[in-house]
C-alpha cells in the first residue's frame, strides 16, 4: 500500500530545516483522545492478540527454533492483505469507520508479528519505544510534504 505524493513543490534543501528553525506551517492542536483512553485501548488490543494467538495455537510457542525474520517472513502475506484492505477502504471511499477498522486490523496483525517472534518482538517494541521517546523538536522535525518525523541531522536523503 503506497500513498503517493503527486506534487512536491519544495526542493530538498527547503524541506530540511535548520537546527534552530521551527516549522511554522503547522499549528499544534491537542490530541482528540485522552492519553489513558488511548493507552487502555492499545493495551486491550495487545491482550486480545495474546489471547487470540493462544486460542488458535498460533502464538510464539509454535515457532521454537525459527528466527524472528523467518517467523515474520511467513506472516507478511497477512499484513499485506490488511494493507490492501485499508487501501481499498480509502480508494472506494468506504467511510471513516471502515478506514478505522482496517487501520486497527493492521495494528492487530503487526502486534501479532511481535508476539509471534517472542522475546525478539518484545525487545524490538522496547527499542523502538525508547528511541521514539528520545526524539524531541530539537533533534527531529516534521517533513512538511509527508508528515513524517525525521532527524534534523544525519539522514539528508530522507528529506529528498
Q: Where on the chain are the PLM-derived regions?
A:
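Short hydrophobic targeting helices and cationic amphipathic motifs
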Residues: 2-3
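Flexible "arm" and connector segments at domain edges
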Residues: 15-160
Amino acid at each position: 500500500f503506497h500513498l503517493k505524493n503527486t506534487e512536491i513543490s519544495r526542493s530538498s534543501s527547503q524541506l530540511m530545516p535548520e537546527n534552530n528553525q521551527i516549522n511554522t506551517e503547522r499549528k499544534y492542536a491537542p490530541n482528540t483522545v485522552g492519553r489513558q483512553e488511548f493507552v487502555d485501548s492499545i493495551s486491550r488490543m495487545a491482550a486480545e492478540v495474546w489471547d487470540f494467538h493462544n486460542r488458535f495455537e498460533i502464538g510464539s510457542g509454535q515457532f521454537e527454533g525459527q528466527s524472528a525474520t523467518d517467523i515474520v517472513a511467513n506472516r507478511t502475506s497477512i499484513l499485506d492483505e490488511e494493507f490492501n484492505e485499508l487501501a481499498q477502504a480509502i480508494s472506494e471511499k468506504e467511510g471513516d469507520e471502515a478506514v478505522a477498522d482496517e487501520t486497527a486490523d493492521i495494528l492487530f496483525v503487526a502486534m501479532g508479528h511481535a508476539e509471534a517472534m517472542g522475546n525478539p518482538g518484545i525487545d524490538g517494541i522496547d527499542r523502538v519505544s525508547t528511541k521514539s521517546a528520545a526524539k524531541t523538536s530539537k533533534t527531529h522535525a516534521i517533513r512538511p510534504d509527508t508528515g513524517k518525523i525525521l532527524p534534523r541531522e544525519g539522514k539528508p536523503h530522507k528529506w529528498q
